[in-house]
Amino acid sequence: MKNRILVVDDEEGIRLLYKEELEEEGYEVALASSGEAALERLDESNIDLVLLDIKMPGIDGVEVLRRIKERWKTLPVVLCTAYPHYKQEFGTWASEAYIVKSSDLRELKEKIREILNR
């Protein structure tokens, strides 16, 4: 059975890039364009890992992370953001990993593999 990854990002180009790259790695990928949509998707689906942007309109990624950890305590979350300074923010510490967005997705793919193989 394929692992299911939920990609949460307000930028469509990022969502589609991650979807294509992760499907090539053999994962099943679901998409959400907002924090609200991500929480709805988690209610409806079995997800094995969440890739979560931090800076989004509406509910930001740090708040989504907090809500995920309240309801789905063991669900791994990888924060993916273009802003490296968020790593120092206390609210991000609950994530399994913190990745700065890059066009090179090797680090992200390696981290996903590592987390899902625990």
What does each model-found stretch correspond to?
Residues 31-40, 61:
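Helix N-cap/capping motif at the beta->alpha junctions
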Residues 63, 83-101, 106-110:
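Alpha4 helix (beta4-alpha4-beta5 surface) of REC/receiver domains from two-component response regulators
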Residues 16-24:
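Charged docking surfaces used in two-component/phosphorelay signaling
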Residues 40, 62-73:
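Short amphipathic alpha-helix used as the core "switch/output" element in two-component signaling
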Residues 53:
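Active-site residues of response regulator receiver
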Residues 56:
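Receiver (REC) domain active-site loop signature in two-component systems and cognate sites
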Residues 2, 46-48, 72-76:
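His-Asp phosphorelay/catalytic-motif detector in bacterial-type signaling
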